[in-house]
Amino acid sequence: MLTTSSSRGQRPFGARVKAFVALTKPRIIELLLITTVPVMFLAEQGVPSLRLVLLTCLGGYLSAGGANALNMYIDRDIDALMERTSQRPLVTGMVSPRECLAFGITLAVVSTLLFGLTVNWLSAWLSLGALLFYVVVYTMILKRRTSQNIVWGGIAGCLPVLIGWSSVTDSMSWAPVILFLVMFFWTPPHYWPLSMKVKDDYARVGVPMLPVVASNKVVARQIVIYSWVMVGVSLLLTPLGYTGWFYTLVALLAGGFWLWEAHGLQNRAKAEVTGGKLKEMRLFHWSITYVSILFVAVAVDPFLR
């Protein structure tokens, strides 16, 4: 239940600050920056300017934070009905819808100008494009209409890879495109296991995530397909000359363990295992570890060639 503006004004200042920070979803942004900074090392083939790294990270944080705030503004009706999102600032009344909207728009404008004036305008437009894609295409159009929402909506989360490259080179190349595709094929098998866990929440609010409209067997099969394509694409960097033995070894080992987990989930789904024994969150947690390991290898590889 939303509180009145007068009661919001009585909230401690520190709690209000924490609420606005929560609107940006810092933990998700950490994952986005994990993919941005290593690509800067790859583009530089060494250590990029510390100033450039800091400005790119700040711009990326503000842009993604603005997108997340606008997402919460649009989804405030269903967030109030889902257990997983019931403590978000708009639901608890710590922040009003008007404040959230103004905050999100402000971050979008500031991040675009920061990128354009201190990094380059290619990065600025990519950043703005990611924000608009997430807010308009995913949140407003796809999320409540199709079970493929996270597949195409996930494009927004892939663009930080391109931004990392463009911030250093002010251009594009095949290397960031390949890593963009890695993230594109990573997103569904990353998010679907979580959706399997909380599918009742999504069903309650009418969001047709794939696990809501399809059986666990179907979802697990899709996870395996996307996983194989993701691992295969991740290995394209080396034959094209962008990475060497270290990245290749890490990609093979990390990818192999991912496939082991994905097939394990599929086998449990085929056996019609349900509840905690399905262990779908094992793959979700590993997916975060996988992308962290893979992109650390992207950053380290130039120093070992």
Curated annotation (Swiss-Prot):
GO terms for molecular function: protoheme IX farnesyltransferase activity. It catalyses: heme b + (2E,6E)-farnesyl diphosphate + H2O = Fe(II)-heme o + diphosphate. InterPro entries: Protohaem_IX_farnesylTrfase, UbiA_prenyltransferase, UbiA_prenylTrfase_CS, UbiA_sf. It holds the Pfam family UbiA. Its EC number is 2.5.1.141. It is an enzyme of class 2 (transferase). The chain crosses the membrane at residues 28-48, 52-72, 101-121, 122-142, 149-169, 174-194, 218-238, 240-260, 283-303. It is a multi-pass membrane protein. It comes from Streptomyces avermitilis (strain ATCC 31267 / DSM 46492 / JCM 5070 / NBRC 14893 / NCIMB 12804 / NRRL 8165 / MA-4680). Its main location: membrane. Keywords: Cell membrane, Heme biosynthesis, Membrane, Transferase, Transmembrane, Transmembrane helix. Belongs to the UbiA prenyltransferase family. Protoheme IX farnesyltransferase subfamily. The keyword Cell membrane applies. GO terms for cellular component: plasma membrane. This is Protoheme IX farnesyltransferase. The keyword Transmembrane applies. Pathway: Porphyrin-containing compound metabolism; heme O biosynthesis; heme O from protoheme: step 1/1. Carbon 2 of the heme B porphyrin ring is defined according to the Fischer nomenclature. One of its GO terms (biological process) is heme O biosynthetic process.
